[in-house]
Amino acid sequence: MINFSNTLIILNNDVPCELLKKKYSELLIPTIGILDFKKKKIYKKYNNIFLYSYQNYSFLLDLNDNILLKIQKYLNKNGILDINLYLNDKSNNNSGTSKKDHSKIEDINKILKRLRKECLYNGYINISAEQTMSENGIVINIKAENPDFNKSDDDNNLVSSDEEIYEKCEDKKKVVNRVCDNCTCGKKEKAMNLEKIKINDNEVEYNTENVVSSCGNCYLGDAFRCGSCPYKGLPAFQPGENVKLNLNNEQN
């Protein structure tokens, strides 16, 4: 059900449209002619704009004075443009009607295709086109919607979810900061960060309070350590735990 309280009627300047103008005026629905619509500025937007024309539709294809684009400016988001063209059939009483009817159908299809393209090129969506037979001609009806490209709350939630997933994936990535065996920059000494305390000739104690492990395997023992691990040779330990080594066992 169309709410005519927020509807504008655009009429071509021909006799049948003048009759429509009187009808809509009686219903207190705002109407305006094609020429006035092109020249005047409208200070309101509408949910529905109806355009009526008899015979003439060339003004819809005029790129220099693009009326479809101007109509879109006065449509609300998701507003509907409803184009109605009445093409009078003057060939009903002529001979060879079958050939002429076939040619006319091809012409109508070309008009429909062209008008749909023009609506699409001007940014309309959900475009539908149909033709119906009337008593003395053919009525072409094209409906098109003015899109609303603003993101909905659901779209924003989806974006947030994707961002969260991406951040979680980034957090799971491990950055392995390995130390070269022949380190000359001092990184190996810094990585060791072990305080060596000699208890006696046979025992040495290591304080692991400030130990830093980039891969997380340094605390697990030699079976899990890489070949260049600075803690290679130490038993498994917990950060902050003092590790005692028996030098006699090492020599053996």
Curated annotation (Swiss-Prot):
Principal location listed in the UniProt entry: cytoplasm
A Pfam family per the record: CIAPIN1
Protein keywords: 2Fe-2S, 4Fe-4S, Cytoplasm, Iron, Iron-sulfur, Metal-binding, Mitochondrion
Any one Gene Ontology cellular component term annotated for this protein: mitochondrial intermembrane space
Domain of life the protein comes from: Eukaryota
UniProt-annotated stretches for the region Linker: 153-166
UniProt-annotated binding residues for [4Fe-4S] cluster: 215, 218, 226, 229
Region (N-terminal SAM-like domain): 1-153
Keyword Nucleus: no
Annotated spans, Fe-S binding site A: 169-185
Required cofactor names: [2Fe-2S] cluster; [4Fe-4S] cluster
Residue numbers binding [2Fe-2S] cluster: 169, 180, 183, 185
GO molecular function, one term: 2 iron, 2 sulfur cluster binding
Annotated compartments: Cytoplasm; Mitochondrion intermembrane space
GO biological process: iron-sulfur cluster assembly
Residue interval(s) of motif Cx2C motif 2: 226-229
Motif Cx2C motif 1 per UniProt: ranges: 215-218
Free-text domain note: The C-terminal domain binds 2 Fe-S clusters but is otherwise mostly in an intrinsically disordered conformation.
Family the entry assigns: Belongs to the anamorsin family.
HAMAP family, alphabetized: Anamorsin
Subunit text: Monomer.
Function: Component of the cytosolic iron-sulfur (Fe-S) protein assembly (CIA) machinery. Required for the maturation of extramitochondrial Fe-S proteins. Part of an electron transfer chain functioning in an early step of cytosolic Fe-S biogenesis, facilitating the de novo assembly of a [4Fe-4S] cluster on the cytosolic Fe-S scaffold complex. Electrons are transferred from NADPH via a FAD- and FMN-containing diflavin oxidoreductase.
The protein's name: Anamorsin homolog
Gene assigned in the entry: DRE2
